[in-house]
Amino acid sequence: METRTLEDWRALLEAEKTLDSGVYNKHDLLIVRGQGARVWDAEGNEYIDCVGGYGVANLGHGNPEVVEAVKRQAETLMAMPQTLPTPMRGEFYRTLTAILPPELNRVFPVNSGTEANEAALKFARAHTGRKKFVAAMRGFSGRTMGSLSVTWEPKYREPFLPLVEPVEFIPYNDVEALKRAVDEETAAVILEPVQGEGGVRPATPEFLRAAREITQEKGALLILDEIQTGMGRTGKRFAFEHFGIVPDILTLAKALGGGVPLGVAVMREEVARSMPKGGHGTTFGGNPLAMAAGVAAIRYLERTRLWERAAELGPWFMEKLRAIPSPKIREVRGMGLMVGLELKEKAAPYIARLEKEHRVLALQAGPTVIRFLPPLVIEKEDLERVVEAVRAVLA
């Protein structure tokens, strides 16, 4: 293994900052290694990771079973288009659909969450022959042109208008607004069971159940975006299980590949059959390397039942945060280990202090919300340290 000096690391950090497109606000550190719920920077500092790759690292950084599966597959076959079947693709399809409701039995594999949502929107139009989409205020579905069209935040959308139209945005958890919006021109309603970027806001059972009923009544599809909520994050395998409904299309990504880029749109058979041959495509989607990672990730999740850990630790963590006696806290909310701490002021300075003073990595979810997405393998003692760090920066 190549040995690098601290000067080498600093040069690489500078290279990333100077040669990057500039789209991202970069932290002033270089992460070089991760294991479980911990990561280390080039100077050897250890951090508790509550960013988790924006929800990618549910199974922990460097999960040994995923690593071994990727190594083994890389030695055999890494790339093959979907027109040429491979054993690992069939294995992945079989493994994934086995843990889903029987209605969701057709898989379109891609590389990311935004691609999964792009596919879902196209399948919805192909199936219904309609154009309109209904989405939620504060909802986030991606930044490519189709998924951006059903993403609420104006700062993301407005510079790139015109986008896919028509799209009608409704207040999240407003059943009456949903009833008014969904009509005979609606192809699909797309919703997150818990809004992530929008401030970690869980749906009410009444809202999601109404979405299922209304779409069925109007002949529209229900797309559930579980890019961030899937793979055990909310205390169930998939968040829709909390609500007793099954969507027409389910989109997954982030943790699905155990750290390897992998996304899917999983749908009902009749929806899949509506897409004409060649109506959608992807070069890398379904590649054997990602398929092997996905199989290993699902099998690890199933064997360890990490969603039960999220169901246990998440409420405990939220109660500990609520017990912090700070007038700066407005609300603590979430589902499982998807947790938002809303402040009465801007969150960014406190997130920076968590990193610099306490070696805790967290992220924003809107201007005033600190979001915690730790790997589901995190130890309770680490979460206790996170609580104490939050207590200290809010003092």
UniProtKB/Swiss-Prot annotation:
Which positions bear N6-(pyridoxal phosphate)lysine?
K254
Check the record and name the SUPFAM superfamilies matching this protein. Answer: PLP-dependent transferases (SSF53383)
Q: What class of enzyme is it?
A: transferase
The free-text note explaining how the cofactor binds reads: Binds 1 pyridoxal phosphate per subunit.
Q: Which GO terms describe its biological process?
A: arginine metabolic process; lysine biosynthetic process via aminoadipic acid
> Which keywords are on file for this protein?
Amino-acid biosynthesis, Aminotransferase, Cytoplasm, Lysine biosynthesis, Pyridoxal phosphate, Transferase
Subcellular localization(s) per the UniProt record: Cytoplasm
The question of whether Transferase is a record keyword is answered with yes
Which pathway is this protein engaged in? Amino-acid biosynthesis; L-lysine biosynthesis via AAA pathway; L-lysine from L-alpha-aminoadipate (Thermus route): step 4/5
Which residues take part in binding substrate?
R143, T282
- Classification via InterPro entries: AcOrn/SuccOrn_fam, Aminotrans_3, Aminotrans_3_PPA_site, Class-III_PLP-dep_AT, Class-III_PLP_Aminotransferase, LysJ, PyrdxlP-dep_Trfase, PyrdxlP-dep_Trfase_major
Residues at which pyridoxal 5'-phosphate binds:
G113, T114, F140, D225, E226, I227, Q228, T283
Q: What is its EC number?
A: 2.6.1.118
Question: Would you name any one GO CC term?
Answer: cytoplasm
Upon deletion of the gene, what happens? Auxotroph for lysine.
Coarsely, its chief localization is cytoplasm
GO terms for MF: identical protein binding; pyridoxal phosphate binding; transaminase activity
A Pfam short name: Aminotran_3
Reactions that this protein is recorded to catalyse: [amino-group carrier protein]-C-terminal-gamma-(L-lysyl)-L-glutamate + 2-oxoglutarate = [amino-group carrier protein]-C-terminal-N-(1-carboxy-5-oxopentan-1-yl)-L-glutamine + L-glutamate
Q: Which NCBIfam families match?
A: argD, LysJ_Th_th
Role according to the record: Catalyzes the transfer of the amino group of L-glutamate to [LysW]-aminoadipate 6-semialdehyde, generating [LysW]-gamma-L-lysine. In vitro, can use N(2)-acetyl-L-ornithine and N(2)-acetyl-L-lysine.
| Family that this chain belongs to | Belongs to the class-III pyridoxal-phosphate-dependent aminotransferase family. LysJ subfamily.
Assembly and oligomerization: Homodimer.
Give the protein's recorded name: [LysW]-aminoadipate semialdehyde transaminase
What is the organism of origin for this protein? Thermus thermophilus (strain ATCC BAA-163 / DSM 7039 / HB27)
